[in-house]
Amino acid sequence: MALNIADLAEHAIDAVPDRVAVICGDEELTFAELEERANRFAHYLIDRGVKKDDKVGLYCRNRTEIVIAMLGIVKAGAIAVNVNFRYVEAELRYLFDNSDMVALVHERQYADRVAAVLPELPKLKTVIVVEDGSDLDYRRYGGVEFTEALAEGSPERDFAQLLGERSPDDIYLLYTGGTTGFPKGVMWRHEDIYRVLFGGTDFATGQPLADEYDLSRQAAANPPMVRYPIPPMIHGATQSATWMALFAGQTTVLTPEFDAAAVWRTIHDRKVNLLFFTGD
């Protein structure tokens, strides 16, 4: 039984491909659409030389692209690094260097900060940019627009042939917030974080779920719950809520910015069942 994050997500994708997986504003992605784009993103990383256990930074607010990238990174056998979008250049430089980051996904509005630190980070060679309506120049350091990267990648799920068997011992990395010093990377085995934070334990009984198909079987047998994590994806709570929803064939609603009135409208309009909220 391979309790690997990529496998667990793929089981749900296979069980409920036409169900809505992610909503952000007016954009919706089904599980099948998420799968295709995540496969493309994973292949793009692999084609650019990203190898197993390489670190890929996610420097974005909550949006569909960050979920595509999260899933694509684990499909590629790499490790995502959560990057606080409030960090200034010194903090970014430290985090990128400390994590040995080789690739980065960032929103366009952060291009000047990225341009300032890249010359000191020779390992960081691949930069993918998510359009956000800003006009900062990312071509100066070789950035590639997110949709262009997806267009270059294969949509196939052929990672077993490319990378070999996945393992429950693969690493999931969560960087702390850095409020009392520089952030620290906390390493989890995939199986452990699934059991503790990502829904792999029955909350009512405290018992581990039966097998890696338990959540996807439940997904196929039941209508979806709609989850709405409010904190930014840099926070472990929102990552946890998102992975739990993906594994269980449920729907995740995301919003890039917090606005109290908009949150209540979203809860009403999207018929949200479960709200995740932390101090930010």
Language model features with spans:
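Flexible, low-complexity linker/hinge segments
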Residues: 1, 135-170
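Conserved AMP-binding A3 loop
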Residues: 30-32, 171-199, 203-207
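Structural core segment of the AMP-binding/adenylate-forming
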Residues: 47-48, 75-151
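A short helix-loop-beta submotif of the ANL/AMP-binding
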Residues: 55, 61-81, 85-89, 97-103, ...
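Adenylate-forming
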Residues: 61, 106-115, 133, 231, ...
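Conserved pre-ATP/AMP-binding loop-to-beta segment of ANL
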Residues: 153-175, 182, 217-226
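Conserved AMP-binding/adenylation subdomain of ANL enzymes
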Residues: 194-230, 234-274
